[in-house]
């Protein structure tokens, strides 16, 4: 599966690693991107998630903003290919969560990865993401105890990155996953989801990373929060969830 993702990625863009410890000011969207956003403006209709995350569809899907004050979508090609739509409740949950993180993590910028098609259905090669209740989030990273963004510019190629069981990037172990940032983000999502009549159904992250995730202050709170983080995965699925964490929401 990871090889399939790599081949797909290489068809979009070339692989390169850039040393970036601070993100630049968001650039003005390209003409093509601006036109796409204009054509897909969100309306006030409430979304309907039909079926399950692995066998479902989406009605009145909403396009997530390509960028905001402290977040952006990870890949323009994916965005323009119609892979960044969500249930309206999930969209509001995510945006409200990032608004809170502007205060609690003021020096951190986040990346949203693939979501769903506007009408849901199969989102190749994902097994879920079919009814607008699934979202992939890029793992935040550190280098020398500072937020690091040098790998965040790879677009779809980011799905091909690998991290060891301690959360260190395989090609440069000085680059590590910021587990405390992830833990706080998940706790924030839980709080905001409740306001929008949602709950976090499950979180998928490489199971060997859970000890690191639960180690810090927010990690300990996460462990006691009741958020279900999967305990076992098939080898293929497990290997694919080291550089991002997947969240499935459920309507309540």
What are these model-derived regions, one by one?
Residues 1-57, 61, 233-235, 250-252:
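N-terminal secretory targeting signals
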Residues 111, 134-140, 204, 246-248:
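Soluble periplasmic/extracytoplasmic beta-strand elements of cell-envelope proteins
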């Amino acid at each position: 599966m990871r090889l399939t993702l790599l081949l797909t990625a290489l068809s979009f863009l070339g692989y390169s690693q850039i040393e970036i410890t601070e993100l630049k000011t968001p650039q003005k969207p390209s003409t093509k991107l601006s036109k796409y956003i204009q054509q897909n403006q969100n309306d006030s209709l409430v979304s309907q998630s039909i079926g399950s995350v692995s066998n479902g569809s989406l009605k009145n899907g909403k396009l997530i903003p390509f960028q905001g004050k402290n977040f952006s979508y990870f890949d323009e090609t994916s965005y323009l290919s119609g892979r960044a739509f969500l249930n309206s409740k999930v969209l509001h949950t995510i945006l409200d969560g990032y608004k809170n993180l502007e205060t609690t993590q003021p020096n951190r910028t986040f990346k949203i990865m693939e979501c769903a098609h506007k009408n849901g259905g199969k989102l190749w090669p994902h097994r879920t993401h079919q009814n607008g209740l699934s979202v992939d989030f890029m793992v935040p990273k550190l280098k020398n105890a500072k937020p690091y963004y040098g790998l965040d510019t790879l677009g779809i190629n980011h799905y091909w990155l690998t991290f060891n069981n301690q959360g260190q990037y395989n090609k440069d172990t000085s680059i590590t996953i910021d587990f405390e940032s992830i833990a706080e983000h998940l706790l924030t999502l839980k709080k905001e989801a409740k306001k929008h009549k949602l709950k976090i159904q499950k979180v998928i992250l490489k199971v060997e990373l859970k000890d690191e995730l639960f180690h810090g202050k927010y990690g300990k709170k996460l462990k006691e929060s009741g958020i279900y983080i999967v305990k076992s995965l098939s080898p293929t699925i497990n290997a694919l969830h080291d550089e991002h964490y997947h969240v499935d929401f459920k309507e309540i």
